[in-house]
C-alpha cells in the first residue's frame, strides 16, 4: 500500500474524454463504478473521476504520474510538483541549466546572485521554476531579473557543444564544467561563496569541477532546488537563453525546431536533412543523442 495520501482535485468535465483516452493509451484498465465517469488503474496507480468533477489519484506511482502527465497535460497547474517557492533570505547564488534534454539548440547554464533586499522584489515579480511558466512569461521575467540582479550565463551552441563533448565524453562532466564556470564568474562579480545548485549528478562531479578551478565554495546540491528563489531565477535565465537560441536556429534554417527529443524532433530533423544536408543537421543538434542515428537511419526509407 502507498504511504502517500490521495491527491484530490477538481477537473473540468470537458477534459474527461481526453483524460480517458490518454489513460487508455497509457495502458490503464477502465471500469465505471457508481457515481463515477470512470476509474482507471494499473500497477501502483489508480485515477478516479467522479461525476461531480472530483478527481482522485492514489498509489505509490502517483507522484511521477501527476508531475509528468496530469499537471502539464491536463490540469495546467503545478501545485503538487512545484509547491510555493521557498524564501531563504541569506544572500546566495543559484545555478540551473536548460537544454540538456533537447536535441536541437544550445545548452545553457545560468547563475543569479540575490542580495537580501532583492528577495521580496523577485517574489513580487512572480519568479518561480521556469518549468511552470510559458515562454512569453519567461522572457518577460528574464528581462526583469537581469535588471535587478547580478547574473552570468554560459551558452554553449551546438557546434561548440559537440566539440567540448568530445573532450568530456560525458554530459554530466560537461554540465559540471558549465556550472563551475558560472559559479566562478559570479563569485568574481559578487564575492559571494554560498551557492545552491539543482543537483543533476553525484555531488562529487560538481565538487571536482570546482576543485579544478581552485574555488572554495559553500555548496548545496539538491534535487528540485528550483523551490529556492535564486535557483528559480537562474532557471528562468537559462530557459530564456535556450528558447532564444532555438528560435534563432529555426530562423536560420527556416524550419521550426521543436524542443525535447520526440517523434516531432525526428520529423524536423529529417526535414533539415533533406533541405540542408547532414553537415548542417549536425551543426544544430547534440550529436551524441540517439535521435541523430534515428534520423540518419530512417531518411530515404
Curated annotation (Swiss-Prot):
| Chain's gene name | rnhC
- State the name under which the record lists this protein: Ribonuclease HIII
Q: Name one GO biological process term.
A: mismatch repair
Which family does the record claim for this protein? Belongs to the RNase HII family. RnhC subfamily.
Q: What class of enzyme is it?
A: hydrolase
What functional role does this protein have? Endonuclease that specifically degrades the RNA of RNA-DNA hybrids.
Q: Which organism is it from?
A: Protochlamydia amoebophila (strain UWE25)
Q: Which Gene3D superfamilies match?
A: Ribonuclease H-like superfamily/Ribonuclease H (3.30.420.10), TATA-Binding Protein (3.30.310.10)
- Return the PROSITE patterns for the record: RNASE_H_2 (PS51975)
Return the HAMAP family for the record.
RNase_HIII
Amino acid at each position: 500500500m502507498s504511504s502517500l495520501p490521495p491527491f484530490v482535485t477538481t477537473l473540468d468535465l470537458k477534459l474527461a474524454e481526453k483524460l480517458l483516452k490518454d489513460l487508455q493509451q497509457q495502458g490503464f484498465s477502465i471500469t465505471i463504478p457508481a457515481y463515477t465517469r470512470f476509474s482507471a488503474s494499473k500497477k501502483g496507480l489508480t485515477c478516479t473521476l467522479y461525476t461531480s468533477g472530483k478527481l482522485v489519484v492514489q498509489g505509490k506511482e502517483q507522484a511521477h504520474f501527476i508531475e509528468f502527465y496530469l499537471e502539464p497535460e491536463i490540469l495546467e497547474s503545478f501545485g503538487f510538483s512545484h509547491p510555493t517557492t521557498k524564501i531563504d533570505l541569506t544572500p546566495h547564488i543559484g545555478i540551473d541549466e536548460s537544454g540538456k534534454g533537447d536535441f536541437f539548440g544550445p545548452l545553457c547554464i545560468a547563475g543569479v546572485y540575490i542580495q537580501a533586499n532583492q528577495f521580496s522584489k523577485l517574489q513580487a515579480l512572480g519568479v518561480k521554476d521556469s518549468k511552470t511558466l510559458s515562454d512569453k512569461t519567461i522572457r518577460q521575467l528574464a528581462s526583469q531579473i537581469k535588471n535587478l540582479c547580478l547574473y552570468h550565463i554560459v551558452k554553449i551552441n551546438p557546434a561548440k557543444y559537440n566539440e567540448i563533448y568530445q573532450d568530456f565524453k560525458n554530459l554530466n562532466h560537461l554540465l559540471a564544467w558549465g556550472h563551475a564556470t558560472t559559479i566562478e564568474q559570479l563569485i568574481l562579480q559578487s564575492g559571494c561563496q554560498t551557492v545552491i545548485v539543482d543537483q543533476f549528478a553525484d555531488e562529487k562531479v560538481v565538487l571536482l569541477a570546482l576543485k579544478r578551478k581552485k574555488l572554495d565554495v559553500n555548496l548545496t546540491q539538491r534535487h528540485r532546488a528550483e523551490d529556492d528563489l535564486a535557483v528559480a531565477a537562474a532557471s528562468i535565465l537559462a530557459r530564456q537563453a535556450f528558447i532564444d537560441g532555438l528560435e534563432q536556429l529555426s530562423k536560420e534554417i527556416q524550419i521550426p525546431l521543436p524542443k525535447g527529443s520526440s517523434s516531432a524532433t525526428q520529423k524536423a530533423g529529417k526535414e533539415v536533412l533533406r533541405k540542408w544536408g547532414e553537415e548542417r543537421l549536425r551543426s544544430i543538434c547534440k550529436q551524441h543523442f540517439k535521435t541523430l542515428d534515428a534520423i540518419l537511419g530512417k531518411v530515404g526509407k
